[in-house]
Amino acid sequence: MKKKNTMRKLLRYLKKYWLLLILSLLFAALTVAMTLYLPILIGQAVDLIVAPGQVEFSTIARLLLKMGILIGATALSQWIMNACNNRITYRTVRDIRSDAFARLEILPLRYIDAHSYGEIVSRMIADVDQFADGLLMGFTQFFTGVLTIVGTLLFMLWMNPLITLVVVVITPVSLFVASFIARKTYAMFKEQSAARGEQTGIIDEMVGNQKVVQAFGYQDRAQGRFDEVNERLRKCSLRAIFFSSITNPSTRFVNSLVYAGVCVAGALSAVHGGISVGQLTSFLSYANQYTKPFNEISGVVTELQNALACADRIFELIEETPQTPEPADAKTLTDPDGSVALEDVSFSYVPEQHLIEHFDLAAKPGQRIAIVGPTGCGKTTIINLLMRFYDVDSGCIRVGGEDIRQLTRGSLRTSYGMVLQDTWLKTGTIRENIVMGKPDATDEEIIAAAKASHAHGFIRRLPQGYNTPITEDGGGLSQGQKQLLCITRVMLCLPPMLILDEATSSIDTRTEIKIQEAFNRLMQGRTSFIVAHRLSTIREADVILVMKDGHIIEQGNHRTLLEKNGFYAELYRSQFDI
């Protein structure tokens, strides 16, 4: 049932290319027709050669010329058919991969957080490639195989129904074997695909975090974990390949029986004058052409099981429930005044395990709101909710008096300038990374933003300055420099609201002071949310919210909270040893 559903989903993609499909089928039929006509010419030539009397070489020459033209035309027709099949396959693969990527872009972060990056990448790259190989083989060999079987059967019935009966009686054994193995291998290939995805995930983790792996001496344990998955993949692959490898020898054995039966029956018929030597030659050629597609189709069926198993995993991604759609009348947030309110907000990552309960917060335009507290208290979660990376379970969040669920996500998020604890840089130049939020920025604006964030100095010292290429992880740059680039992005856009999540945690104290000066200028008149463990970065905040277990337990500015001598004062003293 699941395979049928997968096939129906696939057919929806193929329908767009119905014209190419018809063209492919027409040239497949033409290729088969010309291929099947060739044995008749060969049989006629054999009869001319073995006939009593003088051999008519002129007639044989004409037959040979016909054969040459026919072979050339068959090759051309097959080339056009393959070209059509290639176009159908790779356009379909392009569409599926585009849909998978488009769905990935609108999936809730809950899905991304629940799956390893490598596993998602494996579905979109390795699984799609495997699917493409199976689909191409299916188009290339399945059409011609079926047409060849039908065509040769008709020709053999026309030539000698009795000998054809021998072929038809023995052949179903081959179909039974192929069908049995196909049912067995589908589940095995799906298991193999899943193990391959898990292995890709481990490699992605290890390559991306190799410094941490080596720093903690995790190499042996990482190797053990990889070997365990690698061994599981080997076993899955062996089981799948073992069963699939039985197909070809089994069908070849049955086909040999067919060929032997035709030889015996044909020889007996020729002895009694029921068939000429040339006709027997043609019949043997047809018998060979009739059985050959069964070998190919059995291989195609096995490959298709792998392709369908991979397609099933791809369609699982494409059909994942997307994030809550925006209402049809969603408003675009333009020129917000900076007021933000969280009203009776409750949220949980895991159902019935509340992280934040009945949370209230009111930020006035231009206020600097600092959020502090121990790890896991919900600080970063508040930021996720403000940006609507996650939706609240109950309550609501308002920006400028508007419920953010009634706003377009794009307009909401571009209203915030965000610097995260984990820096992210894309493959490209320094300049391309800075202008991500403002692609039309001038060189003067870029340099001004870099100077304001104190990034201009180190950028100028790079080999090609702002045109220096970097990799996605910012290879060659220090963690502090990478974070400075991320801060420069925000400096360039000058959004009405700011979110700074551990924004200076990777920068030395001297640079941090300069950054704080730049941020003070940037935050002037802008509502700012600052999440930090380093309390030195939030002394100038208008309001400091002290969180614990998803609740605000203290609230005030730096001085009043110290005077209260509560949890904040305890945190402050622990950091500054006073």
What residues fall within each predicted segment?
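ABC-type nucleotide-binding domain
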Residues: K2, E326, L333-I578
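Transmembrane helix-loop-helix hairpins at lipid-water interfaces of multipass membrane proteins
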Residues: L21-I80, W158-L162, G273-V277
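Alpha-helical segments in transporter systems
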Residues: L11, L19-I40, L63, M67, ...
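An intracellular "coupling" helix at the cytosolic face of ABC transporter transmembrane type-1 domains
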Residues: L109-R110, A126-L135, F139, F143, ...
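Juxtamembrane loop-to-helix connectors within ABC transporter transmembrane domains
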Residues: N5, L14, V46, M81, ...
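Cytosolic ends of transmembrane helices, especially the final helix of ABC transmembrane type-1 domains
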Residues: Y218, F242, Y259, Q289-L317
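A hydrophobic transmembrane-helix motif
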Residues: G43, A73-L76, F139-A182, R234-T281
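Short intracellular "coupling" helices and adjacent cytoplasmic loop segments at the cytosolic face
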Residues: Y90, S98-S122, A126-V128, G201-R225, ...
